[in-house]
Amino acid sequence: MNFHILFCSSRHVTIELDEDAIYETASYEIWVNGRLKGVFHRMIQTIDGLLPDTDYEIMLVRANEASDTVTFHTEPEPITLNVRDFGAFGDGVHDDTSAIQAAILCCPKNARVLIPKGTYPVTALFLKSDMILELQENAVLAGIYDRARTPILPGQIEYDNEDGYYNLGSWEGNPIDSFASMITGIHVKNVTICGKGVLDGRADFENWWSRPKDKIRAWRPRMIFLNHCENITVVGVTVQNSPAWNLHPYFSNQIRFLDMEVKGPANSHNTDGCDPESCTNVEIAGVHFSVGDDCIAIKSGKIYMGKKFKVPSKHIHIRQSWMQDGHGAVTVGSEIAAG
């Protein structure tokens, strides 16, 4: 049996088996430096609990068959910033937005912001470049439904000394005011979001999914919104109960979604799984989708955006994923004016 390293960070490695199976295969063991890490059955699997800047050997075993040993070296990581040290409670009651945001803003280059076990109510968090955001197992970022407290991303802000506008918010293919997402990236690069934790929007029919066709202050947020971002990897986490689309990379490049769960009720409104819009080099691999709209919808804006920017979506690579519930597995559009 053969495999290769799909992704490696400071504390995680993701492997992909080189077999003909789709999403799942016969059970196999993963051994790291001679120690059993567990028995697994998915074609793409992430192993955590590694140390930064360290050499490792990994081998797979199935019955009497063993793979070749593959060596890898984890990325360096200068420091960990624990959000509890910045005042986050993680008790499911206090609003932990400002404490977690402070940790993100203080994070030095290539360091880790750690969210340990607990439930952390938040509105919107804004990423910065060159960082790792890790949600440990049983760590939950829990969405706060409060339109008055959630930041708005303006759709169009006119430039002072030149023609055109600065576009931050987007809704269904147009530059329109929208609420900032639980995880928002604006012009950031080199970010990893990882771990076994959960991003839970806590949307239901009493809040965000009520009156889905109405703009109330702004249009509904996504769970992860990446606007003009580059080299972003999301691996291992579960994303669920989104107010609208779950994963929305927008005019971005080199975006990876690996070994994830994306979930929402089958009757939830506009909860697309992953909608790359005017993006290049997007990889979606080992993702389990079960949502209330299209699992994956490739987009490039409505007619206005298509004519103005002429940025198509291209080089979108999708494999080893399970589309369970959803209106469509992989769709093109709507909102595909730029191709």
Model-found features: residue ranges?
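Extracellular/periplasmic carbohydrate-active domains that bind, remodel
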Residues: 1-339
